[in-house]
Amino acid sequence: MNRTVASTSKWDAADYARVGSFVAELGGAALDLLDPKEGERILDVGCGEGTLTLKIIERGATVLGIDNSAEMIAAARSKGVDALLLPAEDMQFFAEFDAAFSNATLHWVLAKEQAGRAIFRALKPGGRFAGEMGGEGNLENLREALDEELIIRGYVPPVEASNWYASPGEFATVYEAAGFREVDARLIQRPTQIDHGVAAWVTTFRKGWLDRAQVPEGERDEVGAAVADRVGSNVADYVRLRFIMRKPA
């Protein structure tokens, strides 16, 4: 079944807020691209624990967040965010939103064609969709270092991809096929300092990868530390794909 990484993804919302706070902190450029207006109704695809959702609300919009992690939805609701536990590809909204937004989510959605069509349906005619995701080349050094460490320890890294790190052309093809026009997608090189260290990043952001490689919980901190030694820096080689598009009026 070609779906989001899992029908519901498991994240530790507290760990994510601690180790991954940079995700929302660096989401300002995508939010500015969305340019939410007072009175608009906006769909936040992959709202996480709701940090950026609240920033949209602060600009006067009404927002519905969706996410496929029960832990993240609980955290978002605790902040007062209107949020639903729902994979992006399963949304059944029809012309309800003036705009849609997504930050650091779409690269997790392997059912990309279905998700693109669902977002398109959710927008009113003339509605816009803006955001950011991991792009082509994202985290190549870190991902390679992790797989090398797994192999040395006798584990088999998963063969199937857990992320869609698209080129601008690949991304545009999917969303134009969904019906969008004026698709503007571009890669942004964004080396990112990981304040809590690469080891914590590995155990938080590559949890699903470690699950699939069947690495025991008791060994994961050790794996993370070894990957940090391999990389030799707390700067992660992030590449973002930033985009904006419109549904025809």
Q: Predicted segments — roles?
A:
Residues 1-40, 51-55, 72-75, 130-153:
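Conserved class I S-adenosyl-L-methionine
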Residues 43-45, 49-91:
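Class I SAM-dependent methyltransferase SAM/SAH-binding core
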Residues 89-100:
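A short acidic, Gly/Pro-enriched loop at the edge of an enzyme's catalytic core
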Residues 99-112:
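A short SAM/SAH-binding and catalytic strip from SAM-dependent methyltransferases
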Residues 113-128:
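A short glycine-rich, Lys/Arg-flanked "PGG" loop and its adjoining helix->strand segment in the class I
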Residues 164-178:
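Short alpha-helix
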Residues 178, 183-234:
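C-terminal helical/coil "lid" or tail adjacent to the Rossmann-like core of SAM-dependent
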